[in-house]
A protein has these predicted regions:
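A short helix->loop->beta-strand "cap" motif at the edges of active sites that frequently abuts
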Residues: 105-109
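Alpha/beta-hydrolase-fold catalytic nucleophile elbow
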Residues: 80, 113-114
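Bacterial N-terminal signal peptides
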Residues: 6-15
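Active-site flanking residues adjacent to catalytic metal/cofactor-binding acidic residues
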Residues: 28-30, 113, 145
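Conserved SGNH/GDSL esterase-like catalytic core that processes O-acyl groups on lipids
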Residues: 22-99, 119-127
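Sec/Tat signal peptide C-region and signal peptidase I cleavage site
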Residues: 16-21
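Catalytic His-Asp segment of secreted/periplasmic serine-dependent ester chemistry enzymes
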Residues: 118-185
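Bacterial N-terminal signal peptides that target proteins for export
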Residues: 1-5
């Protein structure tokens, strides 16, 4: 009996704390998420990081990506979507955010980066960023990563297309994301 008790106590001592077991992140995004792929795991070494990034992924595809994880969907989700969508369709973007948040549920933290890119068909992405900020103000578990402010402070990061950035820019984005993700704990 003592031997069993000793083994049980030893096993408990070796088990990670509950909070460490819950440190998991899904990155759900487009080409900007592709750019941060090598940096995020380095910034969150004690986290289990899963990444689903695809060039040209649209915001309306975000919820389906998350559904594929089912019960394995991490407690924290980073969304990098909207850059490939029509900024004139504010209702569509709001619906995409609502769909992602519905899949996330109230117990998960979602960190969504706002959008930097030139206007599309003469329409700015400021409207999308306002919609995202508005949705975040109404949802305790939705946080905005202020990518717009970061790029405004470091325009030298921007590539010629006005949407993608240099390696230093992706590194800085991953660093900022890691800070936001840690606040979800």
């Amino acid at each position: 009996m003592r031997r069993v008790l000793a083994m049980l106590v030893a096993g408990l001592a070796l088990a990670p704390p509950a909070s460490a077991a819950e440190r998991s992140l899904l990155v759900n995004g487009d080409s900007l998420a592709e750019g941060t792929k090598p940096y995020i795991p380095r910034e969150l070494p004690s986290w289990r990081v899963m990444q689903s990034a695809a060039v040209s992924r649209h915001a309306y595809q975000g919820d389906e990506v998350m559904r594929r994880y089912g019960s394995r969907l991490p407690r924290v989700v980073h969304v990098s979507l909207g850059t490939n969508d029509d900024p004139g369709d504010l209702d569509g973007f709001r619906d995409a955010i609502a769909d992602v948040m519905r899949v996330a549920g109230r117990s998960r933290c979602v960190v969504w980066a706002n959008i930097v890119r030139p206007p599309y068909r003469g329409v700015s992405y400021r409207g999308y960023n306002r919609v995202l900020a508005d949705e975040a103000s109404r949802r305790a578990n939705l946080r905005v990563l202020n990518w717009v402010r970061m790029v405004r402070r470091h325009p030298e990061w921007l590539a010629d297309d006005g949407a993608h950035v240099s390696a230093r820019g992706y590194q800085a984005r991953a660093e900022a994301l890691a800070r936001s993700v840690r606040r979800c704990e």
